[in-house]
């Protein structure tokens, strides 16, 4: 009876699905018209209940009659199926180290990477659903982050699965070493028998290396045929992997191919904030926005720019303003890329530096004496030294025309009354403007 039920199920699913989802599946017991199935993995149990309920229901009814029912139980030990080896066994989980910072939570999603992100997340949640998953994109766009996020997610949520993350260079070196030492069988055992999820980074490194491609081809086939999840990253799409064996390229394309596009400006700003958060650092918003707007080659350089500013801040004890950031990051920014700084934006930055009041406070509704004085100095200098229009000043300072006029008048009256402290601050602001103008 047990074999009839299993055979009936097998006829209702394709070979690939049988090997992937039913390899650890067995009939545990039959009591009257109720069948109890068992599986050795909790994820597979939930997947079968969700996706194969109808198949299982029809199969038991064909064998036991229309009143037949079933349930699926999860058992940690191996079922007694004679069909194939179980998909999952209890073993050490993480076979190679992963960067704990590379998680889905730390990955900022935007229009250019949304598809790849969700594909990777689905693979992490449901290993085998998209197999293989091939992620490609330019340098520093987040391929390694996504690849290791899959590994970190599985380690946290699927304790039965064995995860291996490797670069293709490591795969090559391991192969060469095993051949030199006469341990090729051990190499194949390691990569083909002791892995449930294989994550391969920078596969383009194997271009032109025919011997290792052949080994990878057979490794791929054995893992895939056993229902093991494979995820591959490359800097180019499969069909552009020149000097790769056609049969290997076709394997890369048989699952899901996802591209990572360069992030747009808004996504880069969000990524910059996330990087700052991970580094436990603080930078003014205008500085962070400047970095995101101008360092757009790749995310590694974006992170490098942020770290450089944080190191400067920590080692000098100085706050990093926009002008300082421009000077510090000249090697990160393409020539002629930096836009000329708006005169009033630069003025506000200078006023903040001279008075010790932050840019945010100057532009806020804070009416304490220090913030109010700094705000009025800024509007006064903008009107009388920069010759800016009332409309422009009002827009930049988030104030109405009457407020701007009143602020300018109050500063002028105070200067006429001989307020030396106010005059000193204004002179320092104007002096800094002149100095910056001369330095270009």
Swiss-Prot record:
Protein encoded by which gene? dnaA
Pfam families registered for this protein in UniProt: Bac_DnaA, Bac_DnaA_C, DnaA_N
The entry assigns this protein to a family as follows: Belongs to the DnaA family.
| Protein name per the record | Chromosomal replication initiator protein DnaA
Q: State the organism named in the record.
A: Thermotoga petrophila (strain ATCC BAA-488 / DSM 13995 / JCM 10881 / RKU-1)
Q: Which residues form a coiled coil?
A: none
Where is ATP bound in this sequence? 140, 142-144
Task: Return the annotated region ranges for Domain II.
Answer: 69-96
Q: Which residues cross the membrane?
A: none
């Amino acid at each position: 009876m047990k074999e009839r039920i299993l055979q009936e199920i097998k006829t209702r699913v394709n070979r690939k699905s049988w090997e992937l989802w039913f390899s650890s599946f067995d009939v545990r017991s039959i009591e009257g018209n109720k069948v109890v199935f068992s599986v050795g993995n909790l994820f597979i149990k939930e997947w079968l209940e969700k996706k194969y309920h109808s198949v299982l229901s029809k199969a038991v009814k064909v064998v036991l009659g229309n009143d037949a029912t079933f349930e699926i139980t999860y058992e940690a030990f191996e079922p007694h199926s004679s069909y194939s080896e179980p998909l999952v066994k209890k073993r050490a989980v993480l076979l190679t180290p992963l960067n704990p910072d590379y998680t889905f939570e730390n990955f900022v999603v935007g229009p250019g990477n949304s598809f790849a992100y969700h594909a990777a997340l689905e693979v992490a949640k449901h290993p085998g659903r998209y197999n293989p998953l091939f992620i490609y994109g330019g340098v520093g766009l987040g391929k390694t982050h996504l690849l290791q996020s899959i590994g970190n997610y599985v380690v946290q949520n699927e304790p039965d699965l064995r995860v291996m993350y490797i670069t293709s260079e490591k795969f090559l070196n391991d192969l060469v070493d095993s051949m030199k030492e006469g341990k090729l069988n051990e190499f194949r055992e390691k990569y083909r028998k002791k892995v449930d999820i294989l994550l391969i980074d920078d596969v383009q490194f194997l271009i032109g290396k025919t011997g290792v491609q052949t080994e990878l081809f057979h490794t791929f086939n054995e893992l895939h045929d056993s229902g093991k999840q494979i995820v591959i990253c490359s800097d180019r799409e499969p069909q552009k992997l020149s000097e790769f064996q056609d049969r290997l390229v076709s394997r890369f394309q048989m699952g899901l191919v996802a591209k990572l596009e360069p992030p747009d400006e808004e996504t880069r700003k969000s990524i910059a904030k996330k990087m700052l958060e991970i580094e436990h650092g603080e930078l003014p918003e205008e500085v962070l926005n400047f970095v995101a707007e101008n360092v757009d080659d790749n995310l590694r350089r974006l992170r490098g720019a942020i770290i450089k500013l944080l190191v400067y801040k920590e080692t000098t004890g100085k706050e990093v303003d926009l002008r300082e950031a421009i000077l510090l990051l000249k090697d990160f920014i393409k020539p002629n890329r930096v836009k000329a700084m708006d005169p009033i934006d630069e003025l506000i930055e200078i006023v903040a530096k001279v008075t010790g009041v932050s840019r945010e406070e100057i532009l806020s509704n804070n009416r304490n004496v220090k913030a109010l004085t700094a705000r009025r100095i800024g509007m006064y200098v903008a009107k009388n030294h920069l010759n800016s229009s009332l409309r422009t000043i009002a827009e930049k300072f988030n104030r109405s025309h009457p407020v701007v006029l009143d602020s300018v008048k109050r500063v002028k009256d105070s200067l006429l009354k001989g307020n030396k402290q106010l005059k000193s601050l204004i002179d320092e602001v104007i002096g800094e403007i002149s100095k910056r103008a001369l330095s270009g």
